[in-house]
């Protein structure tokens, strides 16, 4: 018999200490990594539930195990909410991650060796869009597209590459691009050569759900996303489609199970269902609008302080600082800001002379700070503090002073009150 009062603290002090330290770190550090966010206690309640005990290979109503009558309800709720939220008529909520979702799409639509047009990782793309170190770059013939001198996606070049190489699939989406993607234009290019358009909207799914960023679902053959990041749910993946192509939907389902995965994580699927319901609330739209406002407000401060922002601004939740002119590396900036309890990530910038392990830039995102209640006034102050640190990267007195301000504002805006 398992006793409900069993706990980690009394059993595994070493593990519990690390968990508690991470809890403190999240409360006392300002989180600006664009792909990170804080999920709600409701989501965590679902993830810590007895649903974790249940094997449920297959799909609702078509399971390989008995005893699935209640997890069927859970998964169907998640499916229905995903379809409603994004205007899709197909949803698969089983992928364990965004990368797993992407892998399933490749498996469903392509054969190894097929040509794929994807955004260059060094110019804002993602590992799974064709990086040579990733399965996508190893199994498929990847042709990269990128951005023009203004920092915007170069659709003219994309169309030329498509016409020249005749890819079977074109990938839209990004991990470090601050603009708005023209999904309709990408579909037009894909249709001109008979290619699939696959969009990975992981970074902007929350903005899309709230109507703050254009929805790719009406334009793409297939769309994937993570359920964390701007969507603020559990760590996991999701596949969506629209258009009624039942043959495609069957291929996608088979590519997830049994091709790529076995049993789904039912506790995580329940958490996805909760997060999708939260994303339908009016306050979620207000939150996403503030995410976009906060990113713009931060950009304004950095530009006024003489910092170069890739593309000169942002139209979503993130932006890149190009530190080449400041003679700083992304690695140095990341470390100095970290000492002031401000968490960012080093990131390559267009035509970066440094390696991906050093880089010449940092990526900054507003979802997490907005989640804890920061508005324009707070993020402008924060951006100023970041400039103070970057202007005095070797001055520990300045860094300590900023750290004190960070601790103060974190206490005033707790993540979990």
UniProtKB/Swiss-Prot annotation:
Task: Give the highest taxon in the source lineage.
Answer: Bacteria
Amino-acid biosynthesis found in the keyword field: yes
Q: Which Gene3D superfamilies match?
A: Aspartate Aminotransferase, domain 1 (3.90.1150.10), Type I PLP-dependent aspartate aminotransferase-like (Major domain) (3.40.640.10)
The EC category is transferase
Where is the site labelled Plays an important role in substrate specificity?
228
Q: What Enzyme Commission number(s) does the record list for this chain?
A: 2.1.2.1
Location of this chain's protein in the cell = Cytoplasm
Keyword Transit peptide assigned to the entry: answer is no
Alphabetical GO CC annotations of the entry are: cytosol
Q: Which reaction does it catalyse?
A: (6R)-5,10-methylene-5,6,7,8-tetrahydrofolate + glycine + H2O = (6S)-5,6,7,8-tetrahydrofolate + L-serine
Q: Between which residues do disulfide bridges form?
A: none
Keywords recorded for this protein, A-Z: Amino-acid biosynthesis, Cytoplasm, One-carbon metabolism, Pyridoxal phosphate, Transferase
Q: Pathway, according to UniProt?
A: One-carbon metabolism; tetrahydrofolate interconversion; Amino-acid biosynthesis; glycine biosynthesis; glycine from L-serine: step 1/1
Cofactor names = pyridoxal 5'-phosphate
Location of N6-(pyridoxal phosphate)lysine modifications: 229
Any one Gene Ontology molecular-function term assigned to this protein's record:
pyridoxal phosphate binding
Q: Which Gene Ontology biological process is one annotated for this entry? A: glycine biosynthetic process from serine
Instruction: State a single Pfam family of this protein.
Output: SHMT
Identify the residues that bind (6S)-5,6,7,8-tetrahydrofolate.
121, 125-127, 355-357
Q: How does it assemble?
A: Homodimer.
Q: What biological function has been recorded for the protein in this entry?
A: Catalyzes the reversible interconversion of serine and glycine with tetrahydrofolate (THF) serving as the one-carbon carrier. This reaction serves as the major source of one-carbon groups required for the biosynthesis of purines, thymidylate, methionine, and other important biomolecules. Also exhibits THF-independent aldolase activity toward beta-hydroxyamino acids, producing glycine and aldehydes, via a retro-aldol mechanism.
**Entry's family note:** Belongs to the SHMT family.
Q: Which HAMAP family match?
A: SHMT (MF_00051)
Descriptive protein name: Serine hydroxymethyltransferase
